[in-house]
């Protein structure tokens, strides 16, 4: 991962256009190719970003501070396969470092979440009549989807399971769906957000994004026989 703290302007050119005026920002370039622009607020959310697959090239702009040997500012052009661009004009750099993080083991679920995943995989009909399990922990470039299933019509469904369903979980599933829907062997992929409790804000966000919410009764699921599929 490369971390750059720089005075910069940012322009996004694609289906829409967006402009960030000159300010000091943190630029993250990850090993997967993604580039994101952060301010000192908004928690983990970037001001703008480009998801992989995308490619970064550095060129010289016109005029500006001495950020290159010729005295011209450096322009980062981040482009994806659709031709959308994130253009970052670097006016000055305060910090630039690279770090090798290695392979991350991924999020380790607590006991209840892990057991919920196991139980729902075993009793997949709780998702709906005709559902079948493709596999647990279906890997994506950003981590594993809890369950990958097929509905009664054979369409692909990705299921994210939480003990407490909050906005972060919906955002996580949204990112999984974005990646899975790029796979022509799986698309279109629908989403199910399953949890013991789902906060109203998370439910509203999920439903707005076309993600179905499912409340899980952990005690009832633990009491089900392993060879029985029934709704509670």
UniProtKB/Swiss-Prot annotation:
Keywords: Cytoplasm, DNA-binding, Endonuclease, Hydrolase, Nuclease. It holds the Pfam family NucS_C. Its EC number is 3.1.-.-. This is Endonuclease NucS. The keyword Nuclease applies. Signal peptide: none annotated. Belongs to the NucS endonuclease family. It is found in: Cytoplasm. GO terms for cellular component: cytoplasm. Its main location: cytoplasm.
